[in-house]
C-alpha cells in the first residue's frame, strides 16, 4: 500500500463552523493533517470550528479564510 501525497484545498466560502465540520467528515479529511498542510496549529483550527475563536488576526485569521469562515480580503 503506497502513500499518496495529499493535495488539500481551502474550503469554499461561505462556511459556518458547523458546515466546515461537516465538510471535513463528508470528504473524509483529517483536520490535523489539513492544518499541518497549510502550516496552522491544530488547536487554532479546532477552536475556529468550535466557535471559540473568531479569526480576527494572525494565524487564526488566515486559518478562518482557508476554512471558508471569512472572505478573503481584497488587497
Predicted regions and their residues:
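A short, Lys/Arg-rich alpha-helix, primarily the initiator
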Residues: 2-26, 70-74
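Generic structural marker for isolated residues within well-ordered, non-membrane alpha-helices
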Residues: 20, 31, 60
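Alpha-helical structural elements of signaling/regulatory helical domains
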Residues: 29, 54-55
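Short alpha-helical "recognition helix" segments of helix-turn-helix
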Residues: 34-35
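Recognition helix of helix-turn-helix/homeodomain-like DNA-binding domains
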Residues: 40-54
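DNA major-groove recognition helix of helix-turn-helix/homeodomain DNA-binding modules
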Residues: 57-74
